[in-house]
């Protein structure tokens, strides 16, 4: 019966975790709850100690991301696969704002087949320039088959990153790229498969 409940869950009350101020991990919180489609903006507002949101909404039907979802989660280090394989079409520019301790965004938006665009400030607004690991952006937009463009400056300031492996692998709708997309990422040693399967790219 547990499976039945999980598969029908569409959303949760905003104050569900309001009194759980000591929570440090929400790993896989809604992962693979296929019916889950809406998250209240203040769901994590009273959880300032959270360190990891790994696979948070992975494999759900999440349609949109509310502004300020992580506004009070300044200690988070891990966003790996947090939104992977969801139905989101866009993300707010300030989604990671103030999350200055992030170590990885790896695979964060992998398989978001409905995602059409991303804001230029998405990662910069975190301020996590010195805390991200060398592979923090591997697979970041892998298989985002509806993504048509990448904004200039998306990765600006992340000077310690050494790899962007598979970052846009399978982005079949991507038609153009900004000239200086990796201009400030001077430590990079590997771009393996970064634009593999980007069949719409025009020179």
State what each model feature region is:
Residues 1-5:
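Short, small-residue-biased leader/transition segments that mark boundaries at the very start
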Residues 6-8, 13-17, 24-34, 40, ...:
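Core hydrophobic positions of leucine-rich repeats
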